[in-house]
């Protein structure tokens, strides 16, 4: 799955939400780039992640997208630059 978020940080509450969302996402997924996370997690973990995120976000100010792939569907991941892959250190 891929998780992407844009948290409104115009006020201190937004800045706190941003940190909480990042920490929550890191519990389940690999941090790929600023507000982008990816990983292969179970349906149960997806449910927990969604529940935790929904408890943090401001529904009127923040934006969160989750891309999920159904079982058996393979996602081709291609890095187009020469920079190191930030997920290389994960097992």
Swiss-Prot record:
Pfam families: CRISPR_Cas2. GO terms for biological process: defense response to virus; maintenance of CRISPR repeat elements. The keyword Ribonucleoprotein does not apply. Mg(2+) binds at residue 6. Its EC number is 3.1.-.-. It comes from the Bacteria. It is an enzyme of class 3 (hydrolase). The keyword Transcription regulation does not apply. Homodimer, forms a heterotetramer with a Cas1 homodimer. Belongs to the CRISPR-associated endoribonuclease Cas2 protein family. This is CRISPR-associated endoribonuclease Cas2 2. It comes from Moorella thermoacetica (strain ATCC 39073 / JCM 9320).
């Amino acid at each position: 799955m891929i998780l992407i978020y844009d948290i409104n940080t115009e006020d201190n509450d937004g800045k706190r939400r941003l940190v909480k969302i990042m920490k929550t996402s890191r519990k389940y997924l690999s941090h790929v780039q600023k507000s982008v996370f990816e990983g292969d997690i179970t349906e149960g973990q997806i449910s927990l992640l969604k529940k935790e995120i929904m408890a943090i976000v401001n529904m009127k100010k923040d934006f969160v997208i989750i891309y999920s792939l159904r079982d058996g569907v393979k996602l081709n991941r291609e890095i187009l630059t020469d920079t190191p892959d930030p997920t290389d250190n994960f097992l």
